[in-house]
Amino acid sequence: MSSQEQILLCLKWGTRYGSEYVNRTYSMAMRNTSRPLRVVCYTDDPTGIRPEVDVRMMPDFDLPERMRFHPFRRMFIFQKEVEGLGGNVLHLDLDLLITGSIDAFFDYKPELDFVVAENWTQPGQRIGNMSVFRYRVGALTKVWDRFRPDPMAMMDLYRNSQTFVCRTLGDVEFFPEEWCLSFKHSLIPRWPMNFFKAPTLPKDARIVAFTGKPDIDEATRGEWPVTKPWKKLYKHVRPTPWIAEHWK
């Protein structure tokens, strides 16, 4: 690996995540790299984002209204040219913890154009979870070319963006399983032990993703919001203080 600058990409649009998520992603990334790193954030609202982040405005290409706040909106990153990006770029969602060095994500099979975390709820189905993926800018234009003519048709056919991308690309490569974990699916003890044991962080974990509920702050406090009271019988998490050690 050369001393060339590494690029981490995050995307923030809508109101689900505030600027503090971008700022913490920047801080966590900088603590967990030994190389020059530039953090790029594409957003529709740069308010409050720390000045060290390379902020770019989210392109406003024509989309059906129901897709404007859907993950499919990030398909623009698969165009031939994307302002501020080049080479192999590591994309991270905002609802995750960086708990170990991210340099290995750039070093892992660098000749490949796309590497992704395997989706924790679909093992063996060749579907990635696009909260964590690395891609070569400009090399995957067939994703954009397939999406752009009829976005709604792709959404209706595949329902979510990660299935669409992985099925469009065909056979995909996954990062080592122990690097990318789901808090909910990998770390919370199975019922009924989740009522008695707090989640622990494996030593080889580099990324912990918080897909769905609980959110990062809720998991720290030991809260798991539910919409139906009977779900409290099994949806439970103990307070998990190690989250706060990284989420800063």
Where are the model-predicted features located?
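A short, conserved beta-strand element in the Rossmann-like catalytic core
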Residues: 16, 96-99
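Small-molecule pocket liners
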Residues: 74-75, 112-113, 129-133, 206
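Short, acidic, metal-binding catalytic loop of nucleotide-sugar glycosyltransferases
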Residues: 24-35
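Active-site-proximal specificity loops/subdomain of glycosyltransferases
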Residues: 44-85
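Conserved donor-nucleotide/metal-binding helix-loop-beta segment in metal-dependent transferases, i.e.
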Residues: 98-128
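A glycosyltransferase accessory/donor-loop signature
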Residues: 1-21, 35, 41, 51-58, ...
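Short loop/helix-cap segments at secondary-structure boundaries that form the rim of catalytic
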Residues: 45-53, 105-109, 125-126, 219-221
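Short beta-strand-to-loop acidic/aromatic patch adjacent to the donor-nucleotide binding site
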Residues: 86-95
